[in-house]
Amino acid sequence: YTTERMTKSYANALLANIALTRAGWMIRESAKAGYETAEYSDATYPTQRCDEATRKSLYERALKHLSAVITSNRHHLNPSFENEWYLINQRILDQTYRENLFEIPMGIEESSELGYTIGVRCNGQTTQYGHNSSGKQKLTAPYLWSFRDNDQRRDITCANFDIREENGTTVEKLLGNNPFGIYVGKWDIRKMSEENINLAANTLGDTKWMSGINCVRMRYSQVLLMYAEVMNELAGPTGSYEGSAGISAKAALAEVHNRAFSITTAEESYLNSVSTDRTTFFNAIVDENAWELAGEGFRKYDLIRWNLLVEKILQFKSDYLKQMNGAYQRTIYFNYLDAAHTQIDMSSITYKGLPAGKSTSDYHASVSSWGNERTTSTKTQSETNLPSISSGLVGSTQQGSGNGAAVKN
């Protein structure tokens, strides 16, 4: 058994995903009778989904396949989200938990730009890790800000720093006021094998190096989130349904959510608060999907089938403006892990202000942050960069109007 080959588990999970996609919203060449039309929809090419009875049948089909994966007992969550991504970076197939249902196999020096085009950025040549990497895929300040306190996924997913050379030493540099340029930290040169680090170190100039890191196409956490979604549609957050895996939607969501916290007491209260009705619980699934899967290539397509892509882009823009003018810190403080001040203690960064009992003298360094723009005359981030993001889809104004923008009926 190897996750580098398509297995029955992956086939079941993929069929469930196809059923959910079929039950979701999609753009059509022309309106189809009996289908529901979305609020955000083009008059010529409407966004529609199938009728309620058909959706229920598709949810039941998805439930069948997801339950097959869960009850097979072949796959489990790695108890450590950090170790899950350490193993991926190390190119080690996990034979203990098998959280990854399927990975497209890659070859070092032959294929995969994970860690080069996507991942923590090396900003120029470094003595420790070699040459420059591009880190093209970016996350945003509102996304980093959205994580609940003590969620271990935040600092693994959001790399608000780059690696560079200063005075002959490789150092980590906090990015400062760069709210739309946070790198995806799941692929991280610091966690890769010596073979990969040596490959990068011996690659000259701007030449790409191929990491050989497998492309994971389905994780068990995705199975649990899809299961939670389906069970919520069929039975609500806590109900049971024939053909299920014997766990509720809430229990499936809790398994994914609680894995990210060393202490889950406060999270039980959160899970209870979002399990009061179908709509609230669905919104919690949408949030969990973002916290768990960002950067992996799935979120956009889930938002499309939920018809939330436009809404979430507009929400991100609104959240940024609100927080930039309010909650974002003008300056953030942080400590280093080592005496040479080369490695940042990510858990020390004061994104949400100084902790009780702490003063600025308790920190090694500081940088200007996302809230700094509210007191500057030049507002590059809010007035130039923000309007350009997804402007072809939502327009260049906060209200989502303008050429190319989706229109709410």
Model regions: which residues?
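Extended amphipathic alpha-helical segments with heptad-repeat/coiled-coil character used for oligomerization
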Residues: 301-303
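Alpha-helix-centered segments that form part of catalytic cores
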Residues: 256
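Short alpha-helical linear motifs
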Residues: 34-36, 274, 307, 328
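Structured, solvent-exposed acidic/aromatic patches
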Residues: 1-116, 207-220, 233-251, 263, ...
